[in-house]
Amino acid sequence: MVHRNCRAILFYFITFLIAAFYSILPTLAEAPKNYLKGKFYISVKDHFLVATEKMTDNRFKKTVIVMLDNDEEGAWGLVINKPIGKVPLRFLINTLQDQKNEKKELYSVEIPIFWGGPVDEKQIYILHSKEYKNDTTKNYKGISITRDYKILFDIAENKGPQRYLIILGYSGWADGQLEGEMEVDHWILSELDSQIIFEEESKNKWPKAYENSFIRL
């Protein structure tokens, strides 16, 4: 009788494990754009994508990228440690489709800009701290992005966000492309840190982000 009860308990336990396994299959199937590390799926969104020493593309050597999305169409983000220099506000306003012929007295104010990646390098992204917002602001983990001329005027008048980067262009990957680059160790992931984004000197961002990396695929 004791052996029979033990077999019954074992049978029900195994049945429970099988049912539990199949119950999580839909969850695994819904995460094709996440990256398997051990037993956990990690999304690149809201992380730093950090170039390793194995990076072969000279444009991305020692880059740190804030990853803003990854889905079935691919992934994209903004490089944060490649300064271009300072340009007059006029240059930035002229690149915007919704530019307004106003506040021309501010056009000569020089503003530092960064290279965000090789895709659509005339597009402007203002990556900034979260206390500032307007109708075009999108919020992410610990940071925000605004993409209109109003924030540029606010920055020129010292009325903008406390911390910001003005970035031209972005970095993008087609479906499956980033996975392939990570599989050959061109990239690792690191926790997104707003202090590294806004407060570290550009030359220190890559060493800091690389030091904090936690996923090597």
Where is each model-derived feature located?
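Bacterial N-terminal signal peptides
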Residues: 12-23
